[in-house]
From Swiss-Prot:
GO terms for cellular component: Golgi cisterna membrane. Pathway: Protein modification; protein glycosylation. The precursor is cleaved and activated in the trans-Golgi network by a furin endopeptidase. Catalyzes the second step in the formation of the mannose 6-phosphate targeting signal on lysosomal enzyme oligosaccharides by removing GlcNAc residues from GlcNAc-alpha-P-mannose moieties, which are formed in the first step. Also hydrolyzes UDP-GlcNAc, a sugar donor for Golgi N-acetylglucosaminyltransferases. The chain crosses the membrane at residues 454-474. A motif (Tyrosine-based internalization motif) lies at residues 488-491. This is N-acetylglucosamine-1-phosphodiester alpha-N-acetylglucosaminidase. It is a single-pass type I membrane protein. Residues 1-25 form the signal peptide. PROSITE patterns: EGF_1 (PS00022), EGF_2 (PS01186). Residues 49-75 are annotated as: Disordered. The gene is Nagpa. Pfam families: EGF_Teneurin (PF23106), NAGPA (PF09992).
């Protein structure tokens, strides 16, 4: 009895198909670009705001704030594969949810940096593998004949292509993590305050704030006839499709559906409704048809619609920009040159750099006390101020920025702490140019001079005193000698009873008057 062959036989075509795709990638290389799905003519550029009929008072874009930063949260993207039925036909594809898109999502130029300037085309695999993409899809539209990137393209903070204000649906992420969807003026694209770090252009805004927005997009982006038919046909024809958007949690959404123009796949209405049911809030349509490609971990994971050079096989098309999901990266990757990127978050290396990108100078709550400028080395104080936070006025004898200059005033005049001008109207006095207080050598010199002056003064006073004493001594001696050489008067002692005094008195009278009777 023969062994059952059913399950094994069903695997053979699938394996052959995968081998065929792999062989095409390795051997045949370039596709024939035969599944074209173009929204506009190739030869005509539309002017800015062409046919725009925006409702009065309604903003032309939606901004979604970034989710709260959670360094410990998982950054793994969730890829879901679906096979769903639309109008009785089965459609297979992928829907990817990406957490923390500011750090895990990038718009890549074809073949790497410089691809748009050089008008290169490359397969999604060739662009995604060197960039380390875990998940990658084709991105924006391009000119098939020249490879020119169309619309706005900002790749990792670099504006590499500008639409000049041409109105097509845009999807971008600003430096602070805000997700922007909709229509942008040229000034908004070039905004220097909160610039875009990732931005690309699509065609047709599929979902706006949870509602399908295709009709409004057709009015804004115009209905023009082109090589593959009208803009209406571009919207309504079934084909392979790709899209990018976000959900209510701020997660980025990538959508891919296999198909072939007019044979299998989805139209834009079906894709928009499918995304709306997946809680997508805003989304735009990206390049589809033969460009639609999905790469997982560096390997083609979709079924291209373009034929290889050998019509037996299908080959991925060489496209333009690529949307890439990678391991968490810092924005900017070098943390503005002031930090180290660790698991998608910048750890600032300086004491004064702060912020998600280490790009904000912070010198503390006092902010240099409004008397200085905060720099990466701390506060640089204005003239007349000093201290770590510029809160102290210059000490006496110093002036200028940070009080680094000594005053040059003479005669102890005042010195302006800001300009250094000498003015007698100032209350404070200038000190010596070198220091605000005398140095040890100056103190020693001052002490020696003082003691010398005091010593000389004392010696002088001592000499004067000695001279005066000698003069007095000599004068006293001369007076004494004069009394010894001349007459003297005898004064007898007085008796107690007075008799001797009377007799002596009478004797003296007789002696003094010899002519008395």
């Amino acid at each position: 009895m023969a062994a059952p062959r059913g399950p094994g036989l069903f695997l053979i075509p699938a394996l052959l198909g995968l081998l065929g795709v792999a062989w095409c990638s390795l051997s045949f290389g370039v596709s024939r670009d035969d599944d074209l799905l173009l929204p506009y003519p190739l030869a005509r550029r539309r002017p800015s705001r062409d046919c725009a009929r925006v409702r009065s008072g309604s903003p032309e874009q939606e901004s979604w704030p970034p989710p709260p930063t959670n360094p410990g949260a998982s950054h793994h993207a969730a890829v879901r594969t679906f096979v769903s039925h639309f109008e009785g036909r089965a459609v297979a594809g992928h829907l990817t949810r990406v957490a923390d898109p500011l750090r895990t999502f990038s718009v890549l130029e074809p073949g790497g940096a410089g691809g748009c300037a050089q008008k290169r085309r490359a397969t999604v695999e060739d662009t995604a593998v060197p960039a380390g993409c875990r998940i990658a899809q084709n991105g924006g539209f391009f000119r098939m004949s020249t490879g020119e990137c169309l619309g706005n393209v900002v790749s990792d903070g670099r504006l590499v292509s500008s639409s000049g204000g041409l109105q097509n649906a845009q999807f971008g992420i600003r430096r602070d993590g805000t997700i922007v969807t909709g229509y942008l003026s040229e000034e908004e694209v070039l905004d220097p305050v909160n610039p875009f770090v990732q931005l690309l252009s699509g065609v047709v805004w599929l979902i706006r704030n949870g509602n399908i927005y295709i009709n409004e997009s057709q009015a804004i982006e115009c209905d023009e006839t082109q090589e593959t038919g009208s803009f209406s046909k571009f919207v309504n024809v079934m084909s392979a499709r790709t899209a990018v958007g976000h959900d209510r949690e701020g997660q980025l959404i990538l959508f891919h559906a296999d198909g072939q123009t007019e044979q299998r796949g989805l139209n834009l209405w079906e894709m928009a409704e499918f995304l709306r049911q997946q809680d997508v809030v805003n989304a735009i349509n990206l390049d589809g048809g033969g460009s639609a490609t999905f790469v997982l971990n560096g390997t083609l994971a979709s079924y291209p619609s373009d034929h290889c050079q050998d019509n037996m096989w299908r080959c991925p098309r060489q496209v333009s920009t690529v949307v890439c999901v990678h391991e968490p990266r810092c924005q900017p990757p070098d943390c503005s040159g002031h930090g180290t990127c660790v698991d998608g978050h910048c750890e600032c290396t300086s004491h004064f750099w702060r912020g998600e990108a280490c790009s904000e100078l912070d010198c503390g709550p006092s902010n240099c006390s409004q008397h200085g400028l905060c720099t990466e080395t701390g506060c640089h104080c204005d003239a007349g101020w000093t201290g770590s936070n510029c809160s102290e006025e210059c000490p006496l004898g110093w002036y200028g920025p940070g009080c680094q200059r000594p005053c040059q005033c003479e005669h102890q005049c005042s010195c302006d702490p800001q300009t250094g001008n000498c003015s007698i109207s100032q209350v404070r006095q200038c000190l010596q140019p070198t220091e605000a207080t005398p140095r040890a050598g100056e103190l020693a010199s001052f002490t020696r001079t003082t003691w010398l002056a005091l010593t000389l003064t004392l010696i002088f006073l001592l000499l004067i005193s000695t001279g005066v004493n000698v003069s007095l001594f000599l004068g006293s001696r001369a007076e004494r000698n004069r009394h010894l050489d001349g007459d003297y008067v005898y004064h007898p002692l007085q008796e107690v009873n007075g008799e001797a005094l009377t007799a002596e008195k009478e004797h003296m009278e007789e002696t003094s008057n010899p002519f008395k009777d």
